[in-house]
């Protein structure tokens, strides 16, 4: 599931930058669409990282895993939060005043954010995911992992819709291996109304 989430993050960051660079001068409607989709990405990524900070890193610390690695993960999360905030501010400026100059500045801010985000995701996939794979059958790990889920069924449905939007077959297969396909289909079609209404049209 972690790599499915990471793929969705990478995808949204990339297409946000592309959308900003292609934004016609003065197109406020499109700028607000981009801002809405970016806000969804920030919301999903914030939930993902707060869940890791509150659950995974303390769990691994108690198990005696490398404290320097865990400190690096937390530090990278702080850097990502700052980069996301800077990009959000720049995108808000475009939504308020959709000039080519503001769009270019926002695209550059998203590009800078992308470098921070991708460096962290690569680091986590390289050094933390192998640990997680080793612990898949650990009962305490399984109990902790339940705390990573979204707070409500609606939040879960919107997250699933986001993960699938633009996903390749590899990500979709991985998702179906974790959650039964019919469950994913029902939640995405009938419960994920916010995502389908507010975000999905941005990327069509």
Segment roles from a protein language model:
Residues 1-204:
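Small-residue-biased structural context
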């Amino acid at each position: 599931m972690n790599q499915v989430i990471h793929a969705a993050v990478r995808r949204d960051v990339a297409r946000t930058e592309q959308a900003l660079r292609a934004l016609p001068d003065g197109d406020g409607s499109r700028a607000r669409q981009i801002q809405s989709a970016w806000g969804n990405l920030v919301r999903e990524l914030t939930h993902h990282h707060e869940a890791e900070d509150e659950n995974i890193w303390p769990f691994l610390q108690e198990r005696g895993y490398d404290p320097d690695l865990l400190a690096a993960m937390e530090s990278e999360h702080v850097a990502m939060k700052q980069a996301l905030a800077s990009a959000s501010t720049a995108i808000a400026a475009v939504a308020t005043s959709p000039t080519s100059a503001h769009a270019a500045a926002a695209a550059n801010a998203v590009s800078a954010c992308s470098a921070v985000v991708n460096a962290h995701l690569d680091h986590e996939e390289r050094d933390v995911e192998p640990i997680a794979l080793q612990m898949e059958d650990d009962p305490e790990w399984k109990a902790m992992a339940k705390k990573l889920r979204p707070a409500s069924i609606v939040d879960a449905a919107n997250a699933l819709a986001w993960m699938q939007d633009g996903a390749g077959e590899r990500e979709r297969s991985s998702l179906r291996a974790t959650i039964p396909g019919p469950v994913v289909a029902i939640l995405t079609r009938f419960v994920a109304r916010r995502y389908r209404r507010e975000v999905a049209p941005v990327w069509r």
